[in-house]
């Protein structure tokens, strides 16, 4: 625990802090009048987004006298009435201290590129440097199922096969989690799916990842699906009546005349859930087409489970990015990741200081760290 002036930073007490934390979240998420805002429902569990990590901590900042919670860090939130008082900085410093105590060599954060207050806090006051600008790609789930190509076979991999494939092909990708086995075996991971040309492999002829990698087809792609709906739901508020009416009309037409394949707007104006695609990769000239088929398969899975969107996050330089269907107005071209080296004595061997390394073609986004 840390006390500076009238603000105390301490660990969240889930039993006594729940209502105050929920109230703070609501006050921080109120959008500007007349503008569209995105609201998040954590289903009464403030640590739902971090509890699946091997180690996690959530801190709150409260006034020493009134015991009022005025800030928290999971995503960084500070009460509008207590901003510009250094509370965010105190929360970040205390979290970094915990990182160091747990052996972390680096700390990184993600924010929107246009969140100037957040960017300034981390880069100017906390010593972070702008590191990567990945793209968040979001596609709606339509009322109709998507048809997959008859030229492609989609195989469901076991967690052990998926782990073997990921470690042997993607372990050097930036942000690859060392405990990928824990990710794949988590109850929120709905499966890993491999797309191959029809006739090359099938569920009946599949002999494991080792055999596959020793004799791969000309092109293939892989992706895993994470169920964010069980962690949080979202809701778009502030949309005009005209926008709501248009969206409803597209859904009615899609359901009534599915053969028209109308790209309907999902019901985003009431709470909706989503699936997150992670571990996306592949090889070969037609890998992008394979990715497109996997995204269609993921769309149909999301439809079965009542989700409103399917999302992923990839490097801006990702070679397979063009194969990922998405709606531009739902997506974010440039998310911003900032990074800081916590200790000068740390080293990554021949790589050296990671904060100064050039970006690779791909990144591996840990689904446990997906922000609302």
Positions of PLM-derived features:
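An N-terminus-focused feature that recognizes amino-terminal "leader" regions
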Residues: 2, 8-72, 83, 89, ...
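A conserved beta-turn-beta hairpin within the catalytic core of GNAT-like acetyltransferases
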Residues: 67-73, 265-277
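Conserved acetyl-CoA-binding loop-helix of GNAT-fold acetyltransferases
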Residues: 78, 84-98, 124, 286-300
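Residue-level recognition of the GNAT/N-acetyltransferase active site
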Residues: 79-81, 112, 282-283
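Conserved active-site alpha-helix within GNAT-family acetyltransferase domains
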Residues: 101-103, 113-135, 316-337
